[in-house]
């Protein structure tokens, strides 16, 4: 028993459970002075925004202080990553502290947009001042977002899984109810349900293969015995981005939806804005095509976030390692980036077929939206499980060795 509680993995796991308790408790604290009986408060985007909020740690269904979730922070990370590729801006050359501060400023800007859009749409109880309630709820939602960011940082440093655990718990708590409600709304024949169950098993098998498949690049390491050279290699995943593209595309595409809601309150009589907002509504052809395109784009971007050729080549050069037949430095960087690009396209096509293809059914019936999102949800869920599993496995590695004496 003493050995179990002295384990680093167990200690970190218990700390993560404590943080999850705080998260679940906070997600049950509702915003004040709001009529909870009104469910369709965000117009036609309610179902999608509630679903996407659940994927990012939010809870629009119960209108809690965590309703917006980690979506502003995740969207800020995407934008920052895109901006950092521009050498003219020089964002990556600044100090880490300055970069973190600017990321938080960007998170604050997006949090203000989303929180204000939600607060203006909330059904306020008639006995209270609408302006004061909107202001107070906006501040509470922004504070809730930054509290979740802080909670994620705590879990990353002292627990297991970082922000992934919060997102995972939000999915487990909220998504099953969305799926059940969809089955109750859309009457699907039993045969189709059985077929979907079989396809789910096949998809899960393919997903496991894509996540565990590796392309091995032989690497020569200084001081390594010839007997072990066949075990020395650089691993590149068949789908380098994993389930991150789906997770971030849901967060990223929710920002325009919130922005259109906010602009609709500011310019209520603007015909052009109303027409554009209607065309970009969830389930419309424009939104579906943008969703599929961004999903493919993010599959490539996050592949390079996961495996950066410049960083790997620089690390190998400093440690005296090299890939057989490739010169160290820029040649190694170009070689690795070429492989990552090739596999990111393969992963992007897999993501588009599995997570983007079902979205085409939404063009025929918008009620199928949440069902069409399930394959992407499986990809995201699988990636999270594998990430946490690998982290726990790494923490327990030292405990597998027995003392010499």
From Swiss-Prot:
Keywords: Cell membrane, Membrane, Protein transport, Translocation, Transmembrane, Transmembrane helix, Transport. GO terms for cellular component: plasma membrane. It is found in: Cell membrane. It is a multi-pass membrane protein. Part of the accessory SecA2/SecY2 system specifically required for export of possible cell wall proteins. The central subunit of a protein translocation channel. Belongs to the SecY/SEC61-alpha family. SecY2 subfamily. PANTHER family: SECY/SEC61-ALPHA FAMILY MEMBER. This is Accessory Sec system protein translocase subunit SecY2. It comes from Streptococcus mitis (strain B6). The lineage of its organism: Bacteria, Bacillati, Bacillota, Bacilli, Lactobacillales.
């Amino acid at each position: 028993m003493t050995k179990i509680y002295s384990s680093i993995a167990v200690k970190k796991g218990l700390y993560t459970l404590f943080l999850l308790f705080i998260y679940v408790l906070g997600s049950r604290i509702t915003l004040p002075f709001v009529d909870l009986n009104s469910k369709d408060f965000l117009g036609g985007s309610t179902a999608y925004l509630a679903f996407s909020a659940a994927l990012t740690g939010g809870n629009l269904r119960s209108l809690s202080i965590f309703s917006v979730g980690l979506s502003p922070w995740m969207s800020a990370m995407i934008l920052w990553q895109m901006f950092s590729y521009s050498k003219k801006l020089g964002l990556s050359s600044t100090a880490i502290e300055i970069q973190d501060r600017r990321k938080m400023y960007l998170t604050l800007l997006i949090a203000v947009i989303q929180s204000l859009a939600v607060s203006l749409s909330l059904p306020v109880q008639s006995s209270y001042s609408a302006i004061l309630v909107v202001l107070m709820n906006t501040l509470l939602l922004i504070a809730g977002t930054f509290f979740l960011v802080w909670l994620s940082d705590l879990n990353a440093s002292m627990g297991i899984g970082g922000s992934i655990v919060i997102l995972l718990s939000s999915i487990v708590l909220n998504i099953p109810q969305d799926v059940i409600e969809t089955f109750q709304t859309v009457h699907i024949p039993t045969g189709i349900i059985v077929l979907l169950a079989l396809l789910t098993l096949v998809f899960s098998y393919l997903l496991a293969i894509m996540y565990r498949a590796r392309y091995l690049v032989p690497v020569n390491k200084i001081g390594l015995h010839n007997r072990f050279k066949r075990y020395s290699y650089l691993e590149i995943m068949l789908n380098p981005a994993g389930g991150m593209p789906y997770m971030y595309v849901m967060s990223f595409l929710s920002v325009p939806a919130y922005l259109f809601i906010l602009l609709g309150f500011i310019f209520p009589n603007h015909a052009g804005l109303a027409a554009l907002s209607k065309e970009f509504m969830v389930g419309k052809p424009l939104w579906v095509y943008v969703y599929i395109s961004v999903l493919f784009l993010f599959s490539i971007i996050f592949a390079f976030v996961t495996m950066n050729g410049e960083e790997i080549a620089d690390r190998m050069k400093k440690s005296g390692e090299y890939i057989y037949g490739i010169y160290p430095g820029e040649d190694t960087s170009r070689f690795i980036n070429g492989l990552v690009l090739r596999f990111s396209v393969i992963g992007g096509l897999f993501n588009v077929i599995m997570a983007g293809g079902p979205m085409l059914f939404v063009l025929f019936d918008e009620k199928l939206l949440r069902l069409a999102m399930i394959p992407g949800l499986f990809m995201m869920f699988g990636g999270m499980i594998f990430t946490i599993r690998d982290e726990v496995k790494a923490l327990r590695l030292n405990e597998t060795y027995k003392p010499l004496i």
